[in-house]
Amino acid sequence: MKENNKTIEAKNKELRDATKEFNEKLQKFLKDKVKKGFQIKNPNYKIDDNKISSNEVFKNNKNDFELNLPKNTWEEKTNKPESFENYKNVIPPYEDKFLPENFKEKFAPKNIKSEPLINKKDNLKEKNNNPVFDEVKIQEDDKFFDFSKFSETVSNQPENILKIEENDFKEIHDDFVSQYETFSKLETKENTNDLKTNLSSDTIKTIESKNEPEVQIESEIKDDSLEKEISEDDSFMDIFKAEQPDNQEDDSFVIDEEKAKEEYQEIKTNKSIVSDSHKIDIYEENEDLMKLNTLKSDKGIIYQIFGPVVDVKFARNQMPNINDCLEVKLPNNKKLVLEVALLEGDDVARCISMGSTEGLYRGLEVINTKNPIMAPVGSAVLGRMFNVVGEPIDNKPMPEKVEYSPIHKKPPSFDEQSTKTEIFETGIKVIDLLVPYVKGGKIGLFGGAGVGKTVLVQELIHNIATGHGGLSIFAGVGERTREGNDLYHEMIDGGVINQTALVFGQMNEPPGARMRVALTALTMAEHFRENNKQDVLLFIDNIFRFSQAGSEVSALLGRIPSAVGYQPTLAFEMGQLQERITSTKSGSITSVQAVYVPADDLTDPAPSTTFAHLDAKTVLDRKIASLGIYPAINPLESSSRMLDPSIVGIEHYKVARSVQTILQKFEELQDIIAILGIDELSEEDKLTVSRARKIRNFLSQPFFVAEKFSHKSGKYVSTQDTISGFSEIIEGKCDDIPEQYFLYVGGIDDVHKNYVAANSNNKVNSSNKPLNSENKSN
């Protein structure tokens, strides 16, 4: 009897071990099926809070293997089936406890009842949207299943939902039976019958409850069978066919090759769960994805925020394009504009913010405008001040009936560009003579604070408006807000504001705004050139800040820096801007760009890249400004490639070179004059110094925009009058006129008039002096 009890105890242990192994395989099998997208339609298996388990794994009779159902499932429905085949199509009720919050209300099919339907396929033929779980991820800390991806439209017919059928279960079942048979062969038939007799159903339930293993929730589940399924040797069609139930009776199951490819890539990508080193809050991610599923195709949600860089997640196949404009409605009813810079994986677009990201949070709705940033254009923008996205910043309402144009455009093609090289007359003597500007050219303006740069810019704006009927656009790129405010009010006082539009992206704004504000201003200028057929003057202050902002954006996007820390795409970005500044058959855009040279290093990549595009260089000198001569342009350091006899003419070229030669000789004599005095010079050098002083003074000019400061009327001098005036000085026709008569005049005629008037006054005064003395004596 004792031996018999030991035998039974040993057999019980063997049976428990076999049961335990069977349960492990069963649970692993079920988890893999759910992970691949199967819905468990067989109610024999239920999903608990932390594991998948089965009810009454086996019965006493090994040949009558089946899984028992919970009694309440079959109450008042049917008798307990005798075989697996009779209840394989039963649809169990939804398990609310493992679904995310509000999931059932939003996504559950409305025609599925809460109780099971038995063998009634005809009642489920109605079509409806039924999200099917594409993938199940397991979080180690939370111990629950989470559903991170849902298909958008899947038919509700049971034929289209893959189920765990008898043949899917057959492999595990056969393995268990073979182990049970091996166990049975250890004893005689009588002992086996005794074992069956002694093992009651209650005992089996007790064994199951004690030995059923807990599901190990790991951060990464490795399945050899799954690895085998997605190996490179297997084709995606074979894998997709393997997902079809072996005993599928309905012939409506059709293999879609494109869908098979997508599922193969998805299985291959998501075959392992996120590792511990890169945990994600899967539940929060699931909420974002659920929200995405309810949004329209042109909307996404904020996924990640770090500084001015914002990641936006979109629904699958709804990704925006590079440079697309995205809009975010902030809680304060304001609008934030993002520009798409990169397209990351997992349907994420990395964007650069055009404003402050304060107030943003994950899950906030984002609208894809499906267009680049749009800038206001047309006559409505004149006299107004805007930011990078075209919003007015002058405390005035948005202009009515304003047009919009994208800031990203291709430069004019070769056949659209003008082939003529035409000099752009500014009416400023020193520029037109020594540094002639070309229509559609780029001019670099070098000068520090307080040397008259703003006044020169205003005078150019005035002269192009009055002399050519042209317009001006001013782009403040990364400079001080104070300077922009001063410029705005000075333009109002100077009377040129109505011929100008101003666009500002100052240094306190994010790098995205500073990088794109020049394109916004250029877009406005292009509209006037093409639609109004006008000559436009585009001012960019400062072009160095444009390169600097691009460097910041490049670092934020994670690009590898190039020389001196600048972005590797510096030349490309500069070319995108500069190539659009040109002359076409309709009109021209002439750009004057202030250039800051860091540490006076002309080899710095930012200024050196700019120099390659410049046609002229205008240098403002503080020494000349200290002499009270304005505009304080240094005639020796400034240069232009337009100063060529084939372009400006032989006479213009000779006069300009003679002026530069005299000024250069005068510069060389400065040291001798400072040491020995001017009296020690030769007669020829004295004549050179005299003419140089007159030329230096004659390069000055009264400006229209400075009339209220200088109390002198502004002068616009044509190029021909400028050439003739300097020619007379060089030829010695004005040697008898003192140098003070050349200061702040227009043409050479004004010099003669002032001199004659002064002489006549002197004669009158000299003739009156003796008469007065005689009267006194008398």
UniProtKB/Swiss-Prot annotation:
Any idea where this protein resides? Cell membrane
Q: Which GO terms describe its molecular function?
A: ATP binding; ATP hydrolysis activity; proton-transporting ATP synthase activity, rotational mechanism
Residues covered by region (ATP synthase subunit beta): 290-778
The main location is membrane
Q: Which family does it belong to?
A: Belongs to the ATPase alpha/beta chains family.
Role according to the record: Produces ATP from ADP in the presence of a proton gradient across the membrane. The catalytic sites are hosted primarily by the beta subunits.
Listed HAMAP family: ATP_synth_beta_bact (MF_01347)
Q: What is this protein called?
A: ATP synthase subunit beta
Q: Which organism is it from?
A: Malacoplasma penetrans (strain HF-2) (Mycoplasma penetrans)
The gene is atpD
